[in-house]
A protein has these predicted regions:
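Short, surface-exposed ligand- or partner-binding patches at beta-edge/loop junctions that are enriched
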Residues: 79
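Rhodanese-like catalytic fold shared by cysteine-dependent sulfurtransferases
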Residues: 1-27, 35-75, 86-118
Length: 118
């Protein structure tokens, strides 16, 4: 009945698995929340802040606005507040050709021991 509320059922990577990969520079981490959300709670250490509305422009390797980190060919992990928006972002990034994982929400990152930047 409420399938639209479900997050990605098969993320392929947990926040706990992503933490050492981000620290080692082996994966690109993207926070897709809005700037006001990030200002209120901080973001995962090492994450790029790219709100959902800017994702197509900033993450598509064919776009002149694409960030250099997203032209590297490295896998990408995305998160939001709960995992729902990052599930949608995962699909968008996959269509752009990225290997992408939804690691859920910022709370998942924190619960796994991930550091927060303010």
């Amino acid at each position: 009945m409420f399938n639209f509320l479900r997050t990605d059922p098969t993320p392929g990577m947990t926040a706990a698995q992503a933490i050492p990969l981000v620290e080692a520079g082996e994966i690109v981490l993207i926070d897709i929340r809005e700037p006001m959300e990030i200002a209120m709670s901080g973001k995962a250490k090492g994450a790029l802040a790219i709100p959902t509305a800017a994702l197509a422009m900033r993450a598509d390797p064919r776009s002149p606005e694409c960030l250099a980190e997203l032209k590297s060919g490295k896998p990408v992990a995305v998160y939001c507040a709960s995992g729902a928006r990052s599930s949608m972002a995962k699909g968008m990034l996959a269509r752009m050709g990225h290997e992408v994982y939804n690691i859920g929400g910022l709370a998942h990152w924190q619960q796994a021991g991930g550091a927060i930047e303010r």
